[in-house]
Amino acid sequence: MAGAIKTDRWKRGMSNPLSRIATRVAYGASQLPRVAWYVGHSLAMRRLAETARRRDGGAARQHAHTKAPVPDRRRLYADMAMLFWQDLANVEAGLYPLPADHDGSLFTLIHRSRLFFEDLPAIHRRRERRAHNEVLSEETRGKRPRYYLQNFHFQSGGWMTDDSAERYDTQVEVLFNGTANATRRQALPQLREVFAGRDQRKLRLLDLGCGTGRFLDLLKQVWPRLPTLGLDMSEPYIRHAKRHLKRWSWMRFIVGKAEAIPVPDNSQDAVTSIFLFHELPPKVRRIAFSECARFLKPGGRLVLVDSLQHGDQPDYEGLLDLFPQNYHEPYYLSYTNEDFCALAADCGLTYIRTVKAFVSKVMVFDKPATKTGHPHL
């Protein structure tokens, strides 16, 4: 209950005008430098890519293209601002405390920035040559499913190396212009609905595809004593997550596949998955979704955070076309056309709502409660 008490105290403090002003100043002081840092990386990355293309004497491939509308930079920045206003509104409403992004020390930021820029030439080379199978080798073959052994995002090492895990969060924040953590936090109000008034120590949550543990870090800031299980197929990413989350207790991690999750039926009060489902082949994606339904308790909640899909935001349609062309995302197109409401119905889950969050969205599903289940709604 400690996390809930802390959040309630924070909410009461928001009724004080001075506290509200202080909160807004603190929020801006933490988020604006992050955005500037990662937008700066994004602009530098684009300039370096253009320089590399001119140096190479033109394109070695057909460049990304779309006939669908693409938002201009002014629109993108306006929608980024809307996401941050929503993030701040959630803080002021007491849905979660003023967040700490835990990006690390200045030395750590510079180290990860160096790793990011050092990998750009190799990423450019792979993108121009459409090379994405360097991860597949005699050493890795058979250790992971074939669909997993690729250079996703054209990054070195795919998901299979410690350097990849160290670079990953910088790459994602650059791609999202510093909004990735704010996007992840939009899942927290959906969990608060089902956790409110309950002893967090007696609940269970599984984060599917936990990666480097950034969402679990944000989750623990609200429910520090909530027992959580992080599952990922990458041992290096799990190792990174353990280091990043060493400040928290009540945590376990396992290496495993989303399509064969080693947990009992009806064992989890909530399941979360952040930016995973667009990385899965259609068949695996549907099996993974059914697995989530299997081990959710009656009355439990599934919260997915992932990319927008076709039809969600008409003037963003072009971005959905360009993304898999610029970044190696072989299963993204099928994801953008996946009917998750139909999947939910087939698995016995009830669709609750979708909340848009800049270029992403939060999808919420519940497993109907039995007569003895927890009536959280």
What are these regions (language model features)?
Residues 2-142:
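N-terminal accessory segments
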Residues 167, 178-201:
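Conserved alpha-helix/loop element of class I SAM-dependent methyltransferases that forms part
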Residues 201-211:
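Conserved class I S-adenosyl-L-methionine
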Residues 206, 214-260:
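Class I SAM-dependent methyltransferase SAM/SAH-binding core
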Residues 259-271:
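A short acidic, Gly/Pro-enriched loop at the edge of an enzyme's catalytic core
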Residues 286, 303-347, 351-355:
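C-terminal alpha-helical "lid/dimerization" subdomain adjacent to the S-adenosyl-L-methionine
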Residues 286-298:
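A short glycine-rich, Lys/Arg-flanked "PGG" loop and its adjoining helix->strand segment in the class I
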Residues 347-377:
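Core SAM-dependent methyltransferase catalytic element
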